[in-house]
Amino acid sequence: MIMPKKERKVEGEEVIRVPLPEGNQLFGVVEQALGAGWMDVRCEDGKIRRCRIPGKLRRRVWIRVGDLVIVQPWPVQSDKRGDIVYRYTQTQVDWLLRKGKITQEFLTGGSLLVE
């Protein structure tokens, strides 16, 4: 009796959906690390928000200046404060650029997003 060969998964080829901002969430680029889990983030609406990194994200992800993130503005002081919800990897940023969700100018500090 001949048995079929097992299919082997090639490492690094795992398909993961790229999360996009939902509801009132925004794209943002980290401008400055302030310490104690706080960062200044330039958001897609042109405002600079002081955002905190929630504990569950702080323990798992290292966020640096220049990283593309998703920001959830707070219900109170929504144009000044927010939470960082997700950090994109470089591969995910490249995919967002190819699909036209963000522009290179937004990442480098120029104009805002493509709608």
Swiss-Prot record:
SMART domains: eIF1a. PROSITE patterns: IF1A, S1_IF1_TYPE. GO terms for molecular function: RNA binding; translation initiation factor activity. InterPro entries: NA-bd_OB-fold, RNA-binding_domain_S1_IF1, TIF_eIF-1A, TIF_eIF-1A_CS. Keywords: Initiation factor, Protein biosynthesis. Seems to be required for maximal rate of protein biosynthesis. Enhances ribosome dissociation into subunits and stabilizes the binding of the initiator Met-tRNA(I) to 40 S ribosomal subunits. This is Translation initiation factor 1A. The lineage of its organism: Archaea, Methanobacteriati, Methanobacteriota, Thermococci, Thermococcales.
